[in-house]
Amino acid sequence: MKTFVLAIDFTDSAAQVADYALALANQFHARLVIVHAYEPRADSPTDSVHTLARLEQIKEQLTHRSKGSVEVSVVARHGEPRASIKAVVAEEQADLLIMALADDRPYTARFMGSLPTDMIPQTVVPMLILPPCSSYKPMKTVVLAIDLSEPTDAVILGKVKEFVQVLGVSLDIICMDDNPDSQRLEAAKRIQELFDGLPHTFSFLPGYDLTITLDDYSVTHPADLIMMLPKHHNRLAIWFMESVTQQVARQSLLPVLAIV
């Protein structure tokens, strides 16, 4: 993974989000591209100048903190935020998109959602969603929530493995299933074989709501990150339904990494 794109706003939590992205980029030896997408106002023609100045200030601060070990660049892009962020991800050939639920009212972001959760079904690269006011700390344990009702893409599991190896974490794989049949037990066995040589566990857990199941699991199994494998949905479903990954990202107190 060579390039991370951080889509940032200028709320109070922006500095913490930038520090988190910087630490992660440093761990992966990746360059960090910071983008601020905004819709210019007719009554404020100097928006672009002020935006670029603030981004340059953030760039200088991060470059100083990393002592130059992370290449940091900035992009100010005016236009509809979703389209602008997706365009920068494509132009920079990003390997990871990072966004935060950075609403000035964190509980509003958690219960109502925001731009980051809206973008989960649209992302074409892995996407890390940070809860408000996230602070980076070295990770020890990652939870991978997996659905075995459909075949799991080996390429996507390969990306999961890469993240686990670089982060140097143990992996807790969970599947919400009260009574797994032989087919799902066999699928679980194949997945465990893929992670052979890496510290990991696999558990089938009862439940009907993954968010609740993850909360219950975290009581006895503390983790630093949740990984999800979003399913592909048609456009109609994207418009009218919230996916499981979106729901977990919106309500989780932990960062959520959607692997696509």
Q: Which residues make up each language-model segment?
A:
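Rossmann-fold cofactor-recognition segment
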Residues: 71-74, 202
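Charged docking surfaces used in two-component/phosphorelay signaling
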Residues: 76-84, 210-211
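Short helix-capping segments at alpha-helix termini
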Residues: 62-69, 194-197
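A short, acidic, amphipathic alpha-helical segment used as a generic capping/interface helix at domain edges
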Residues: 209-219
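Active-site phosphate/pyrophosphate- and oxyanion-stabilizing loops and adjacent acidic/basic residues
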Residues: 22, 60, 117, 161, ...
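Small/aliphatic-rich secondary-structure junction motif
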Residues: 1-46, 140-204, 219-226, 251
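Gly/Ser-rich helix-loop-strand patches that form or flank binding pockets
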Residues: 86-135, 219-221, 225-260
